[in-house]
Structures are given as C-alpha cells and as structure tokens.
A protein has these predicted regions:
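Short alpha-helix boundary/capping elements
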Residues: 35, 63, 133, 137, ...
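Mature N-terminal segment immediately following signal peptide/propeptide cleavage
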Residues: 23-43
Length: 235
C-alpha cells in the first residue's frame, strides 16, 4: 500500500515540477490532502522540499498507535442486552445514558488525536478506513468495540490491505454492525458477506449470489465472547 500511496502523494504534490521546491501553494495543497488543516509552520517546513522529499517526509513519520490516552472507562464490563432488560427501569435508563455519554467522549478522544497528532496522514487514513469499513454506535451500542476498531484501523492504516481485511472481518464492532455475530450454520446471515464483496472489495456486479452464500458459509463461526466483547471463533 505504501508504494501506491507514494504515487498518489506525488500526484497530490504535482503543483511543482519534480525537482523544484514545492512552494507555499503546492505544500499547502499536499498537506491539506494528506491531513486536515495545515498550520503556517507546517506549510513553511514543506515549502522548500521537492515532491519526492515531501512524500518521503510524510511517510517517514507515520504512526500505528494513538498517542492520546484511552478513555478511563475503556475496560469497563459491558452489559448484554438480555441482562440490560432485567435491570430496573431507572438502572436501565442510567446505563443507556452512560453509553451515550461514553460515545460522545469517544468522539472527543478521536478528535483530540486528530488535532494533536504530529502525523496527520495517519489520522487521515484512519478516517478513510473508518468510512470504508463502516460501523456506528446506535447498532454496535457499546463504545468499547468501536474504540478497539479505531485502534485496529490505525494499526493497519498504511499497511497491507489484505492484512487489514483479514483483521476487520474478525472485528467485534463490524461483526455486530453487519450481523456477522449472528451468522450460524443452518441459519446463515449474508449481510457481512455481501458488504464484504460489494462495498469492501469487488464492487457491484463483480460477484454472484453463489459467491455471497459461500462467503457467508465461510464466515460462520466468527462470533463475540459475551462476557468480554472480544472476537471468538465458534466451531
């Protein structure tokens, strides 16, 4: 993926010829496309660089882990839906309010990482994969799996797509969001298999219904430990 990204970044920096200094305009364009909103200091640092030097600097500092400390509740035990229904009304309402608060805190945690990171490219690519392998709080319910998915996307943000794909189909947040955790032998759920082919890899019209059914069969057993929220494989 890094070779492909290098080529893309060189195109993004094409406002200047290959051996000339980028200049402020091309540097700002490159940093905007590979990050969020570059500061004047960042633009000034890239302005005297050639295209190749700029790309090499961008790729040299990439990260695979977040620098912002995790939210304090990240290892709290999750309450399963069946257990939640057994709670008194006031406790159930309080727990749901807690989940909403934690989800907002999780968004704030990631926004802080985006703002403070010394490597905006890492967060830009993490955001790209977050939009590609979509999961959302209303269905996932718990913020802990979404936090761990964010870590996973960052770890592989600039690595092998094949490695990321193998990891993401075992990701608890995605398994919940696309019903992979309820895909059972004899009672297949094809949602994850269909999205895997149509949205994540091949594209519409490049697979058959038989492909979907066989992929769903191959993904049976991918499940979640109800006590920890971690991925488990059930035979």
């Amino acid at each position: 993926m890094l070779r492909l990204l290098s080529a893309v970044l060189l195109l993004a920096a094409s406002g200047a010829s290959a051996e000339q200094a980028l200049g402020d305009a091309a540097a700002r364009q490159l940093l905007t496309r590979t990050g969020f909103a570059p500061t004047a200091g960042e633009v000034a640092a890239f302005s005297p660089l050639t295209q190749r030097q700029a790309v090499e600097r961008l790729l040299a500092g990439t990260l695979t882990v977040a620098r912002t400390p995790a939210p304090a509740w990240i290892d709290d035990k999750i309450v399963l839906p069946r257990d939640l229904q057994r709670l008194p009304d006031d406790e159930r309402r309080t727990y749901r309010q807690t989940l909403v608060r934690q989800s907002l805190e999780l968004r704030g945690w990631w926004l802080r990482e985006m703002v403070d990171t010394p490597v905006p490219l890492t967060e830009r690519m993490t955001l790209f994969w977050h939009n590609h392998f979509v999961s959302a709080q209303p269905k996932v319910l718990w913020p802990q799996p979404l936090y761990r998915q964010n870590l996973l996307l960052r770890e592989h943000a600039l690595g092998s797509f094949a490695t990321l794909l193998h990891a993401i189909v075992r990701d608890p947040a995605l398994l919940i969001y696309l019903d992979g955790a309820t895909n059972r032998r004899g009672q297949p759920n094809e949602n994850l298999a269909r999205e895997l082919m149509e949205l994540f890899t091949l594209g519409q019209g490049r697979y058959t219904e038989t492909d979907v059914k066989e992929a769903a069969r191959a993904l049976t057993g991918h499940s979640i430990d109800p006590t920890t929220g971690a991925f488990v494989y059930r035979r």
